Amino acid sequence: MDQTMNETLLDACSSDKLDVAKEMIEKGADVNFKNGDGRTCLMRASKRGYEDIVDLLLENNVDVTARDKNNDTALMGAAKHGYLNICRKLVEAGSDVNAHDNSGRTSLMRAALLGETHVVEYLVEHGADMDLIDEKGRTALIDAVNAFKVDVIHYLLAKGANVNKRDNEGCTCLMRACYSGNADLIYFLLQRCADKDVVDNAGRTALQYLRNVDDEQLKQLLK
């Protein structure tokens, strides 16, 4: 097969050139062609939100489970950038909602970190495991707390995410919130049964993480 056609198809899918992509496929270009980094046409189109290109590739039996050198999938790219319709199409076509990259990062973690609430909701409703951890021991909820994504935090906790999960340093969501100095978030986590008495790997409690909060009532709650 002509490698030039494959590369032209990849370029077309990367730049939303639907007519060129159709032409290359009709001429026999490989919809599953990978570049030197292992990235595919579907990965490129999905992370850029090119829904028509994604539809074209799906119609031509593209592999939705393909991985690049980092073990990223097309779904991870779409989830990270909040492209809900593309996420739907990929999951319906067989994408694994719990697939993780070489760092243990899942589609849910990526969406949670960037506050893509609708994508988070869709993934959880379709089987995404909220308590999976990455190589640093972080869950999607810990990511959301670190990034102050309040809507995501509320949703994940309402769905039963473990508020007391500890990362590799022994830190919990409450400790991270205390370190950020976000009093509203600290109160909310305490209301959702965050354990103030958990200690990290260095023996510190949430109270010892507290910064930039002049709230005696809160300090008493954390004691």
Question: What are the functions of these language-model segments?
Answer:
Residues M1-K27, G36-R39:
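Intrinsically disordered, low-complexity regulatory segments in ankyrin-centric signaling systems
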Residues M1-T8, H126, K159, Q191-D195, ...:
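Ankyrin-repeat-protein effector appendages
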Residues K17-I25, Y50-L58, Y83-V91, E116-V124, ...:
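Ankyrin repeat structural motif
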Residues D11-D16, R44-Y50, G77-Y83, R110-E116, ...:
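Ankyrin repeat A-helix N-terminal signature
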